[in-house]
Amino acid sequence: MLSRRHFLRLLGSAAVLAAGRVRAQDWEVESPVVTRMREHLQWVIGGMGMALDFRAIDQAQNEMFRIQINADNLQPVASCFKAFILPYYFLNTPVDEWVYDDNSVLYSMVVHSNNAATGVVLDNVARRVPGDENAVVKFNNFLLQIGLSGGLHSWNWEGSPTSGLTDPRFAPSLVNGRVVRLRGQAYQVDNAFTAADLARGHDFITRGEFFTSSDEVREALRLSKELLSIPSTATGYQSPIERVFAPGYTGKDGILPASDIQTGRVVNDAGAITAGPDTYIIAFMSAGESESVALDVLREVIGQMDVYEAAIGGTRLEELIYDS
């Protein structure tokens, strides 16, 4: 459980947000409806190479439930982590130098998922962050500050100024256990995250603006969500979650073809869906399974969101589809 008090401590540790004292309440015992939801999703995922962190936030910014299935298992991350570069950029760049229009390198990074642009943003921000560490290490330090437990090992792409830079803390290794384990095999994948970490990052983006007294921080997180919410109609591309349920989606996906990685095809998507006053954070990771199977599982996750809304007398999915 991530209570509001715990969330505030987490944000305070980042030295970027300040908030007043609030009560820690949230949930202490999993409700029967959530237990049924969790058991259903465990049955759906079974022994497949998938991981899920699925949580709900109410309008008072309390966490209503959290369902985690293989959520602490490392999986290839593809491009999902790029969502977290947005607050990293905004919180380390003077407001009068923020550039995020559709011709900017930041836009290219997050909307078009340009890998070279990602390296340029990491390099540019690192030059503003104090210390002698390289750009990959500095970004990872930010991830740790906002509550994640992992980070990038490297970002080696042609045209990227981060090529050749590494963070030894997150090097793949059979010795320290930083490997992706699928179907009894261990794979040393260069960049691996957990679904739990992806959910933590989106929790920071989703709730952070409500707990800060800084207008600058609030605007940084608001803009991060705005860029992550650019509709597929603007790009002609839909993420896996959007292909299942597009209304109210804010997030970043990542796809790797089987020819590019030894684990087999990677299908990742992480973000938030707004349903009336409630927000659902979904972090889904799949490796070695077909895209059609991954989409089927995401349909089940979205279906359980509807189950929960029905149980609490909330907003049904057909209402969201109609409103969109």
Show where each model-derived region lies:
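Active-site-adjacent helix/loop patches that line small-molecule binding or acyl-intermediate pockets
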Residues: 27-38, 101-199, 204-208
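Short, well-structured active-site flanking segments
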Residues: 91-108, 113, 213, 217
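Active-site SXXK
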Residues: 74-98, 109, 282
